[in-house]
Amino acid sequence: MSLFRSRQAKIHFVGVGGIGMSGIAEVLLNLGYTVSGSDLRESETTRRLAGLGGHISYGHAAENVLQVDVVVISSAVKRDNPEVLEARRRKIPVIPRAEMLAELMRLKYGVAIAGSHGKTTTTSMAAHLLAHAGLDPTAVVGGKVNAFGSNAKLGKGDYMVVEADESDGSFLRIPPTIAIVTNIDPEHLDHWKTPDALRRGFVDFVNRVPFYGLAILCIDHPTVQSILPDVEKRVVTYGESHQADYRAEAIELSGHAVRFDAFRRDEALGRFEVAMVGRHNALNALAVIALGDEMGIPPLVTREALRSFQGVQRRFTVRGEVAGVTVVDDYGHHPAEVKATLQGAREAFKRRVVCLFQPHRYTRTRDLMAEFATAFNDADVLLLTDIYAAGEEPIPGATAANLAEAIRAWGHRDVTVVPRAELARAARERIRPGDLVLTLGAGDVTAAGPELLALLER
């Protein structure tokens, strides 16, 4: 305890280049801790951490943990990882990333954003609002926030804004003072087993709020609404529903922005604008409006903060335009995210949409095959590529070809399966001047956009 409090502890992260691990490592480095980490390959993230003073190793080896006091792992780290085995042999504590995040949050008032979709954007907006309001928050986000140039920020204020990860149940380790839930969809059932267990997990997460805290819940989402009777702490709701405590009306989708009127019950708070695409981002912004209002931040300050929000990398990021073809990249990989992103693309650009989609994980493809089958209706052309395994083993019946067959069966007229290495070339053959090309998925499909732009520039 004295080592951690005196900041003399040597903390090692296995898989430090991961988006969830790197943010915590960066905050600890900025606090003055000795931080080391390992990853399989060098990346922009590991280079950034090394530049901040982190000791980064490539490859996993027992000698990486010989001089450390604690080892931090994510759920992606296998039990037989040599660093984990050596740490346990030496009786060095091995803890999940959420436990380390919780230790940082104990020093602050925690604002934790959870949900199946939209939590990275909402977390980023919330951190930006608190910064704009002069509260100088610490933030750990599951994506690179453009205004921070990173997925983490160390602040001197009393608040810490974090993205809460439900995928492995680890959000039940963190102590939020304010909890926001954007939505709850059946996802990560490899961990939760049943949708009801997932729902119960969110109830437990919200009930971790202290008696003086607050839960901010999206009443528009039926599963979120269903947890209201089980929540034992103070709740405010938000959404388009007339039953919402904070309500959005007159939503306008125009180009790269969404505008709407916000109300606190029957009191008008004003018209707000955020430079994000898609109706769903009106609700993400509304959650932040509710947060600001409940914290006593004037609506005018919130309006200015949302208007100046610069977004998050890989959340509808325009990668470039060549020969009249615009290339956009997005992280969406769940059917609900895919559907919302494609709808937003069509509404914002009003062009023909060519979608390059890479399924993420065999389990997700298998479990959500039926939902994926109807998620691509707003794509005029769909190029499907190989499943990004994310460490999983192949599952019979869960392939890109199986997914393409399901999408065609539900009526899509233009679906083609293309190997990842040939994706950019295949896209070049299909596009026309004026098209919007959307690379979509949580894997390395993000690189296909620059590859296509390079081909178009030749």
From Swiss-Prot:
GO terms for molecular function: ATP binding; UDP-N-acetylmuramate-L-alanine ligase activity. Keywords: ATP-binding, Cell cycle, Cell division, Cell shape, Cell wall biogenesis/degradation, Cytoplasm, Ligase, Nucleotide-binding, Peptidoglycan synthesis. It comes from the Bacteria. Pathway: Cell wall biogenesis; peptidoglycan biosynthesis. ATP binds at residues 115-121. Its EC number is 6.3.2.8. It is an enzyme of class 6 (ligase). InterPro entries: Mur-like_cat_sf, Mur_ligase_C, Mur_ligase_C_dom_sf, Mur_ligase_cen, Mur_ligase_N, MurCDEF_pg_biosynth, UDP-N-AcMur_Ala_ligase_MurC. Signal peptide: none annotated. It is found in: Cytoplasm. Its main location: cytoplasm. GO terms for biological process: cell division; cell wall organization; peptidoglycan biosynthetic process; regulation of cell shape. One of its GO terms (cellular component) is cytoplasm. It catalyses: UDP-N-acetyl-alpha-D-muramate + L-alanine + ATP = UDP-N-acetyl-alpha-D-muramoyl-L-alanine + ADP + phosphate + H(+). Cell wall formation. Belongs to the MurCDEF family. This is UDP-N-acetylmuramate--L-alanine ligase.
